[in-house]
From Swiss-Prot:
Protein name: Glutamyl-Q tRNA(Asp) synthetase
Classification via InterPro entries: Glu-Q_tRNA(Asp)_Synthase, Glu/Gln-tRNA-synth, Glu/Gln-tRNA-synth_Ib_cat-dom, GluQ/Sye, Rossmann-like_a/b/a_fold
Similarity comment text for this entry: Belongs to the class-I aminoacyl-tRNA synthetase family. GluQ subfamily.
Source organism (scientific name): Xanthomonas campestris pv. campestris (strain ATCC 33913 / DSM 3586 / NCPPB 528 / LMG 568 / P 25)
Binding of Zn(2+), residues: 101, 103, 118
Length: 297
């Protein structure tokens, strides 16, 4: 794990406006970076055009600015980085660590959707997968969720790096960019906890050092499901950011009294940095609706 100066990031996908769960991840990652005296960077993960919403990235950046969360460097857009992903993929193909595959989801259904061996001949539509040998396990110590171990071979199988439709897979793009940006600490929602073992396997194949990981609890809506754009979660109000900012502070387990009753966004964040305690972060995978923006102070 990295011994370099702390460098964190927040990396939303432009599929809609930021909701309260997004704000929690942004604020949590920002506070941890500031607490460590490090940098915090913003990356727009716009590698899936069919899911992207026009103007969403601009609105997301506007919302972050309204909440006083500014990137410590230029915003990186994954849509500008095809050449870097192609270079990494070529290395893996040349070394035999990756291979082309035309197996469809329907064809893999009989194997539980897990790919170990190709069951279809190569066709025009070809994905590229990372070869995951038998007995491949990945284990890491999450700073909040504890020790996580996964048998990547039996539970995941060969990992898609480039989809059959030509779009880059999340796993490849995030590993390449975290390494290129020198990210030492990945702080994100617990919905991505399951992705981490396969990213560790890919990092090893590419010869890059893994960052440290901390997965914040998810915010669940009144229906018990994760707040998400796909479930029509309400966007945070960037015209009146203080209520949501205070609610996110509480959801991170921090003492409400640490923030001044009357202050600007900048003033609230200044006090937040001074009084933030990582030890108070909730050591759970999810939080119920009581911690949402409408929770009492």
């Amino acid at each position: 794990m990295s011994s370099l100066p702390y460098r964190g990031r927040f990396a939303p996908s432009p599929t809609g406006p930021l909701h309260f769960g997004s704000l929690l991840a942004a604020l949590g990652s920002w506070l941890l970076a500031r607490h460590a005296g490090g940098e915090w960077h913003v990356r727009i993960e716009d590698i899936d055009p069919p899911r992207a919403e026009p103007g969403a990235s601009e609105r997301q950046l506007h919302t972050l600015a309204a909440f006083g969360l500014h990137s410590d460097g230029p915003v990186l857009y994954q849509s500008d980085r095809d050449a870097y992903y192609e270079a990494a993929l070529s290395r893996l193909l040349r070394s035999g660590a990756a291979f082309e595959c035309s197996c469809s989801r329907a064809e893999l259904a009989a194997m539980g959707g897990i790919h170990h061996v190709c069951v279809a001949p190569l066709g025009i539509r070809r994905a590229v997968r990372l070869r995951v040998p038998p007995n491949t396990q990945a284990s890491f110590q999450d700073a909040l969720q504890g020790r996580i171990t996964q048998d990547v071979y039996s539970e995941v199988g060969d990992v898609v790096l480039r989809r059959a439709d030509g779009y880059w897979a999340y796993q490849l793009a995030v590993v390449v960019d975290d390494a290129a940006q020198g990210i030492t600490d990945v702080v994100r929602g617990a919905d991505l906890l399951d992705s981490t073992p396969r990213q560790l396997v890919l990092q090893q194949a590419l010869g890059v050092a893994p960052p440290r990981y901390l997965h914040l609890p998810l915010i669940l809506g009144a229906d018990g499901r994760k707040l998400s754009k796909s479930h029509a979660a309400q966007p945070v109000d960037d015209s009146d950011p203080l209520p949501a900012l205070r609610a996110a502070w509480r959801a991170l387990g921090q003492a409400p009294a640490a923030l001044p009753a009357r202050a600007s966004v900048a003033g609230v964040l200044q006090h937040a940095v001074q009084h933030f305690s990582p030890q108070r972060l909730p050591r759970v995978a999810s939080l119920d609706a009581a911690t949402r923006i409408d929770a009492p102070a």
